[in-house]
C-alpha cells in the first residue's frame, strides 16, 4: 500500500476538490505537480486554523446572503403585482413577447434592487392578462411574483 501525503488545495482542481480542501494524494503528485505550481501547500496546524476561520467567515456570509434573499422575497410578496406595458395589435396579441428582462426591469423600477434576468423564469406571454413568474433569489430561496401585462 502506497504512502499518501496530506495537502491543502490553494485552488480548485476538478479531480481533487475545492480551494481550501485537505486531500490525500500520492507523494510524487504533490512533490512534482501540486506544490511547485502553487496548486497546494503542505498541511500545518496554522494552515488548518486559517482554513477553519475562512470557512466560518464563508458560512456567516452565506447565511447573510440567504437572509437578504428571504427579506427580498418578503418585499416582493408585499408589493404583490408588477405591471408591464406592451404594444398590442388589433386582435389583442402583443407585438413580441414579455421576456425575463422585462420582468427584471419592472422589479428593479419598483424595488430599486437589481435582479439578474437569468434567475427569472417567465411563461410564454403573447397576450394581455395576469401571469406568474418564478424568481430564484438564492440556492434555497425562490419567489413567485404576479405580472400584469397591459397595453
Swiss-Prot record:
Keyword terms, alphabetized: Ribonucleoprotein, Ribosomal protein, RNA-binding, rRNA-binding
One GO CC term on file: ribonucleoprotein complex
PROSITE patterns: RIBOSOMAL_L9
Pfam families registered for this protein in UniProt: Ribosomal_L9_C (PF03948), Ribosomal_L9_N (PF01281)
GO molecular function: rRNA binding; structural constituent of ribosome
Signal peptide start and end residues: none
GO biological process, one term: translation
PANTHER family assigned: 50S RIBOSOMAL PROTEIN L9
Function: Binds to the 23S rRNA.
Family membership: Belongs to the bacterial ribosomal protein bL9 family.
Full protein name: Large ribosomal subunit protein bL9
Organism: Prochlorococcus marinus (strain MIT 9515)
Amino acid at each position: 500500500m502506497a504512502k499518501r501525503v496530506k495537502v491543502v488545495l490553494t485552488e480548485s482542481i476538478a479531480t481533487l476538490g475545492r480551494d481550501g480542501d485537505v486531500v490525500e494524494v500520492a507523494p510524487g503528485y504533490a512533490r512534482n505537480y501540486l506544490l511547485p505550481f502553487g496548486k497546494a501547500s503542505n498541511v500545518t496546524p496554522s494552515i488548518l486554523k486559517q482554513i477553519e476561520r475562512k470557512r466560518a467567515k464563508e458560512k456567516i456570509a452565506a447565511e447573510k446572503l440567504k437572509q437578504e434573499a428571504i427579506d427580498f422575497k418578503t418585499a416582493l410578496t408585499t408589493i404583490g403585482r408588477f405591471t408591464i406595458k406592451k404594444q398590442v395589435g388589433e386582435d389583442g396579441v402583443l407585438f413580441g413577447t414579455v421576456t425575463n428582462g422585462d420582468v427584471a426591469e419592472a422589479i428593479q423600477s419598483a424595488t430599486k434592487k437589481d435582479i439578474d434576468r437569468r434567475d427569472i423564469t417567465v411563461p410564454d406571454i403573447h397576450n394581455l392578462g395576469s401571469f406568474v413568474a418564478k424568481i430564484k433569489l438564492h440556492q434555497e430561496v425562490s419567489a413567485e411574483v404576479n405580472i400584469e401585462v397591459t397595453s
